[in-house]
A protein has these predicted regions:
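Carbohydrate-active enzymes and regulators
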Residues: 1-150
Length: 150
């Protein structure tokens, strides 16, 4: 018998079919609900925050008073963050941009206790850069998840 894992997560486009401000407020509501739910329900083990750490800044821009609550869930391994700063279309950006994106994601993860997801997360790229394995290996990441464009 094969084992399947269901991972609770969001895929978060900061702006897509709605203006940034509308998406931002929907995100704030989602995070408020997530934090409340995780604090009340210890059986809710983990939530994957879409591989991007900028979401932490976006949330705390509106709810700075919740930093300690959010950080505790991250430190406890219940909210998985990173490794990226933003979830880019890595095929359309330069190699240098992808390196800097990973460095910025790592730096922000350090500010939240240093736990970051060691998964090269590419759920929504329209192709993958040839340097992805090299970049991930240099970052100590040996697993990748990718979606469309392959």
């Amino acid at each position: 018998m094969k084992k399947a894992h269901i991972i609770s997560h969001t895929h978060w486009d900061r702006e897509w079919y709605l203006p940034y401000e509308k998406h931002h407020m929907l995100y704030i509501e989602m995070m408020d609900t997530l934090i409340d739910t995780m604090e009340k329900d210890q059986e809710y083990k983990c939530f994957h925050l879409d591989g991007q750490t900028i979401m932490l800044e976006d949330y705390l821009q509106v709810r700075p008073e919740n930093r300690a609550r959010l950080q505790k869930l991250i430190e406890d391994g219940r909210i998985a963050i990173g490794p990226w700063y933003v979830l880019q279309d890595e095929f359309l950006t330069s190699s240098e941009s992808n390196v800097r994106n990973l460095q910025m994601g790592y730096k922000l993860a350090q500010e939240f206790g240093g736990k970051w997801t060691k998964i090269g997360y590419f759920p929504d790229s329209f192709g993958n850069m040839g340097q992805a394995p090299q970049l991930l290996k240099k970052a100590g990441i040996d697993t990748a998840v990718f979606g469309r464009g392959v």
